[in-house]
């Protein structure tokens, strides 16, 4: 099996999206999970102007655009079993569109409680449950849940199944369901905490499996490791943490790695690291990688072990500004990237490299303002179920 380092290093740009009418930052990317012989794959991109653009996966031709709704959108995700695409909104809803449909209006609307302003969400692996994280209001920072199963072809509005309110004390910036267990979900917050829940429990206090502390505001979380029994997180001040949940019921520490500022300790060959973008767990190789970059558009691949982060290789010549999002396709070994230069790029290994002129960095203000708050307390704690 070819090493992912070699796969990544051999990537070249094969497609670039067409120039949009309104240049925006590309803040999030996801691809359709369903395979249809008569239909090509889709790419959904979250833009800083509050819209979601749907592209053909191979040609990167813009097919349609969803937008115009009140509130800012956060996150973008395809369903696992169909071509529905979701996003959370600060107007207190999670919206669902038909990515192949003609209508620009949502086909489902998941309403939160009156005070909710959602800034994160995810859909579980069976497409049965949606969970969204809200900004703190008064003393409450809510995780809200809905039944996501379709019951009608017409526009339907769903009220929440319930909410968790006792486990975070500030804005909930990240929510991620387990890739194969529909009952497990992890959340991250500006309070620095990363919480793991088992939704099969009846009460919130019983559902809380573990609480880990990143000691800073959480910007990204994900599952990794064999059977996805590990979690990692990144912070708004470029910290990185990695925990092993296999050790919850042992005397072994669950912290595999805790780096307060990756920029200070990572040696990048012939360059430097300005920020972290996200994590990449390669299931077949059972290896965790961290993706970072520079303000001029270079992308770095870092290998993650308990000894630290090691620079593996870099991609350059594609973006001209900060890269905000990526999506790695394991089956095709291809990469989609989006950035502040408004460019969506498709990279593939071994392809004939095409010559492109990098676009100038956009001089526009991002609609997403991240607040960084540093906290200090125990590196982690665990709650045992009674």
UniProtKB/Swiss-Prot annotation:
Coiled coil: none annotated. WD repeats lie at residues 21-65, 68-107, 112-156, 167-207, 213-253, 318-357. The keyword Repeat applies. Keywords: Repeat, WD repeat. SUPFAM superfamilies: WD40 repeat-like. GO terms for biological process: corpus callosum development; ventricular system development. It comes from the Eukaryota. InterPro entries: WD40/YVTN_repeat-like_dom_sf, WD40_repeat_dom_sf, WD40_rpt, WDR89. This is WD repeat-containing protein 89. It comes from Mus musculus (Mouse). The lineage of its organism: Eukaryota, Metazoa, Chordata, Craniata, Vertebrata. The gene is Wdr89.
